[in-house]
Amino acid sequence: MLLYLADVVIFSHAKVYMEKIEKKNNSLKKFHIKTYGCQMNVYDSEMIEKIVSGLGFTLSERAEDADLIILNTCNIREKAAEKLYSELGQIRLLQKKKQERILIVVAGCVAQAEGEEIMRRAENVDVVVGPQSIHSLPELIAKVNRQSGKAIKMEFDPIEKFDYLAEETRKRRVPQSSAFLSIQEGCDKFCAFCVVPYTRGAEYSRSTEEVYREALSLTTKGVKEITLLGQNVNGYHGTLDSGNKVLNLGQLISRLGKIPSLKRIRYTTSHPVDMHKELYDAHANESKLMPFVHLPVQSGSDKILKQMNRKYTTADYLKIINEFQNARSDIAFSSDFIVGFPGESDDDFQQTLALIEQVNYAQCYSFKYSPRPGTPGATYPQISEETKNTRLQKLQQLLKEKQLEFNKKMIGKTVTVLFDKKHPDKISGRTEYMQQVFSDDSNLLDKIVTMRVEDASTFTLKCTAEDIIST
């Protein structure tokens, strides 16, 4: 990992400045972070938490107790910006109530998309920072306090984000036995409905050795399951430290599988056009790789797929499904669907329903199309909200039926469950296929347990523990 003197100076300067402020005015102590959207944002928030903690702040679960509030935003769904401004309005009321200064940071994809417009519409915002510039938070916060002004940074440079961060920011707080690990960011596909290429930038992959070191570090902290993240994760092409060899996702998984204390590997989100033989081979040969693939198709209509600029047909997609099934017979799939994309006819929608019947997904996510400013889809003639709502309701009903059908087929079989979440009176975990399981036995927390399925509902399995296979 590269450690640059300039980064150390900035980080140290910000920390010293914050310490001076604390001594002078014992108020800038606590920070609160609210995360919206995808797993990548969850990962980024973990990085932000470590960065800000390094400045002397402590995490507060309540915004009301915080001196610094960070909103890590998502711009995928419609009205994301308006939801942000509504949230900032609530924070403004909190500021008036406390009659104290609260530093406000807007991070993430809405920050990247809106930029200075955020500060124009919400004067209480102090810092706007894009997702590829979160490593600059110490500098930006120090600048705001030093000059009592505003700070904004939205450069697209994932190399800085991943490689130039001071070592302190990489020592993650991992309270659970499962963790996310970002290996790839950005997207070059430019689907007609998606803002990711505009908010996350071009595709960038971390080096294989850097990913390996972070995975190894996570396992030393008790992590048993790692989910590899990327906007287009199977487009991963990381170099070895020598720079002379490039590994794809399948090869990376095979390498990570050699870490003894790592028990489970997952990855998300995949794009159908970037599948490769080594990934199929990994599913066939790497026992730590879960037999579950999230493979968004978006539509079952070739006409709509072309309109979306997805670059594959339903036949291409089904061939990929078949390749995975040939690699591992017990593999299952989840997907994403968008209904009501411009030009979608009743026949196009029926083709989507037919695809769902054919694949028999274990679970899926479904959305009605929402135009995103700056994307091609926003310029097309739109379908009525009434039609979109009707189709979404029909789609979700079918998806629930298929999910229940998949879960019911598990009754009488054994599954392995990693219990990684604690609730007030129970613990919960997930099977290989992402089904949720609850238990009253708190001794099973952070353990992988073989369980027999006794009953099933749409979203959960009822199981009886048989054996602990990993402590």
UniProtKB/Swiss-Prot annotation:
Keywords: 4Fe-4S, Cytoplasm, Iron, Iron-sulfur, Metal-binding, S-adenosyl-L-methionine, Transferase, tRNA processing. This is tRNA-2-methylthio-N(6)-dimethylallyladenosine synthase. It is found in: Cytoplasm. Binds 2 [4Fe-4S] clusters. One cluster is coordinated with 3 cysteines and an exchangeable S-adenosyl-L-methionine. Residues 408-467 form the TRAM domain. Belongs to the methylthiotransferase family. MiaB subfamily. GO terms for cellular component: cytosol. InterPro entries: Elp3/MiaA/NifB-like_rSAM, Methylthiotransferase, Methylthiotransferase_CS, Methylthiotransferase_N, Methylthiotransferase_N_sf, MiaB_methiolase, rSAM, rSAM_horseshoe. GO terms for molecular function: 4 iron, 4 sulfur cluster binding; metal ion binding; N6-isopentenyladenosine methylthiotransferase activity. The keyword Nucleotidyltransferase does not apply. Monomer. It comes from Neorickettsia sennetsu (strain ATCC VR-367 / Miyayama). PROSITE patterns: MTTASE_N, MTTASE_RADICAL, RADICAL_SAM. CDD domains: Radical_SAM. Residues 29-146 form the MTTase N-terminal domain. Its cofactor is [4Fe-4S] cluster. Pfam families: Radical_SAM, UPF0004.
